[in-house]
Amino acid sequence: MESRKTFDSIPDDLFVEIALRLSSKSIARCRCVSKLWASILYRQDFTELFITKSSARPRLLFAVLKASGLIFYSSPQSQNPSLEVDFHNHMKFHEDMNLYMCSYVSGFDPIGKQHKVLCMNKRLNKEWVHYILTLGTENLKWRKMICPLTHEPYYGRALSINGVLYYFARTSCFLVVSFNVRSEKFKFLDGKDFSNFHREFINYKGKLGVTKLECDAGDGHPRELCVWVLEDVEKQEWSQYIYSLPKIKVNRIRNDNIFAMFLPLTI
């Protein structure tokens, strides 16, 4: 009993300082030591401090898809990277998923201070279903969602801005999907102007921006850059800017997933 009393009598500020130096896996283990430790390590202020500290020593995260779920591995990101990786977590799919094809996007709720993962998967019967996972909770569990419009996530990088997650999708037409991470509600914006492969989302001063690169039909060189900025989500009002690009010599590498241009160092 005396050892237990000494064990739990560590001052909170000292305990937090020590815990901030641990790995996330060690933090999870410490939460099981005692109710007192769990109450401290589950606090929102500790989570924010831990994320801030961890971001100063970033790690690369790898996910391997297996029949039973996703297996995560991580490796320190340093100037002299090692090929060694650590086993991080094994997360099973929801038993109802019955996967044929799946896509994952993540977003952050700045009010609730929560990271969430949105999973969209195509089942064997060709039906698209949606699941949501809230990270940092005691019981990591996928929750099935009801989406008002069946849609297929489309080629392109998702972007999270001020608690709203944006990604491209298509039904019978091309869409920009807006997903509120906190309320978990969908909105669908007309995306017909962006329906080609040369476009990306950008964060334009806290607003959603979409860039679209137009290329010459003859030689394939970039001709102009179009930038749309979403001014009003409810009214679907966009402002548009068009920049004409000078015709310069470029070398391009392109395949189904990569499009890169090598430009002169001085312009």
Curated annotation (Swiss-Prot):
Domain of life: Eukaryota
Residues forming coiled coils: none
PANTHER family with a match to the protein in the record: BNAA05G37150D PROTEIN-RELATED (PTHR31111), F-BOX ASSOCIATED UBIQUITINATION EFFECTOR FAMILY PROTEIN (PTHR31111:SF130)
Residue span, F-box domain: 4-53
NCBIfam families, A to Z: F_box_assoc_1
Annotated SUPFAM superfamilies: F-box domain
Origin species: Arabidopsis thaliana
Protein name, entry field: Putative F-box protein At5g38810
